[in-house]
């Protein structure tokens, strides 16, 4: 392969998780490179123990002289996370797997006043599609299970338009330079295909940047911090903390719902919600309502918008 296969994803997207799993199983690359803290690479086997998901990698640093505050960050994994499915699929085909992102302690805290073209592009898309927010837009465009075949090209086009010609802020440029070095190193081995799983915002830039990296015999080294203690370990996490509505900016709304969509598919997940949250035994006519209304809703909206309708009906009994 003369080019790495760079798969831009949205973190914790069931559709992207299915795509990543399918690509690794069909392409069988020798290297699977995943956006995640590279300081955990020496302990990556710990991720394959019998965990109860979600779990998270916690990376931290503590300055010994107290001159600066310490820093820490979590990298969470749920079953429906593309990164988690990449790890599992890579393990099954015995690919060499590495995390390729800078841990939080190696990332710059520099403030950048560059305009946020991502928000501008999102705003244009929301106006064009008349969607309420970026989560609804994402569902509308990508979480439809019937569109899985077209998903790779749709994602590539979407993220290319989203990134445009923006250089990114200082932090993203620093992270992308490090990730590009990892891709360049894997390609320079010239002994097998390379597949990269990264946030879609980074994908268009990494597809070009890796070519500019100098040759490296060994895997890229992490920067060192003077007078600081750094480390990382696995920790339990919670579904609530995965929710974008709880303040986790890289999350998806309603992570329990996302997990059900991953396990069962959209329609069965909606039926499961109806059964679980119905306060009383439903009559036959009540059970028939969604089966009659859903096709009508689909005529009015995109199919995946029915997920929201399912959810609302299950929790409140209300339908439009």
Sequence positions of predicted segments:
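Compositional signal for N-terminal targeting/processing segments
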Residues: 1-320
């Amino acid at each position: 392969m003369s080019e790495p296969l760079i798969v831009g994803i949205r973190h914790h997207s069931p559709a992207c998780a299915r795509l990543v799993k399918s690509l690794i199983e069909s392409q069988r690359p020798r290297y699977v490179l995943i956006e995640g803290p590279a300081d955990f690479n020496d302990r990556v086997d710990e991720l394959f123990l019998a965990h109860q998901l979600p779990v998270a990698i916690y990376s931290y640093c503590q300055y010994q002289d107290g001159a600066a505050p310490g820093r820490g960050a979590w990298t969470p994994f749920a079953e429906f996370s593309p990164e988690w499915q990449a790890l599992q699929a890579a393990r099954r085909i015995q690919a060499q797997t590495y995390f390729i992102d800078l841990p939080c302690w190696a990332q710059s805290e520099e403030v950048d006043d560059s305009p946020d073209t991502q928000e501008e592009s999102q705003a244009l898309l929301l106006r064009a599609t008349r969607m309420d927010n970026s989560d609804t837009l994402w569902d509308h465009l990508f979480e439809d299970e019937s569109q899985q075949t077209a998903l790779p090209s749709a994602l590539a086009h979407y993220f290319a338009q989203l990134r445009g010609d923006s250089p990114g802020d200082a932090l993203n440029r620093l992270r992308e330079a490090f990730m590009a070095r990892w891709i360049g190193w894997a390609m320079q081995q010239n002994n097998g295909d390379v597949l990269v799983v990264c946030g879609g915002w980074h994908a268009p830039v990494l597809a070009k940047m890796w070519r500019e990296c100098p040759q490296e015999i060994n895997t890229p080294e992490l920067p060192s911090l003077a007078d600081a203690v750094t480390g990382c370990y696995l920790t339990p996490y919670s579904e609530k903390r995965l929710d974008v509505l709880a303040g986790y900016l890289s999350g998806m709304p309603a992570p329990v719902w996302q997990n059900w969509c991953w396990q069962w598919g959209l329609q069965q997940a909606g039926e499961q919600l109806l059964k679980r949250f119905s306060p009383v035994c439903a009559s036959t006519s009540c059970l028939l309502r969604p089966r009659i209304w859903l096709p009508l809703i689909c005529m009015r909206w995109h199919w995946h918008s029915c997920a929201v309708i399912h959810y609302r009906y299950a929790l409140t009994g209300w339908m439009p």
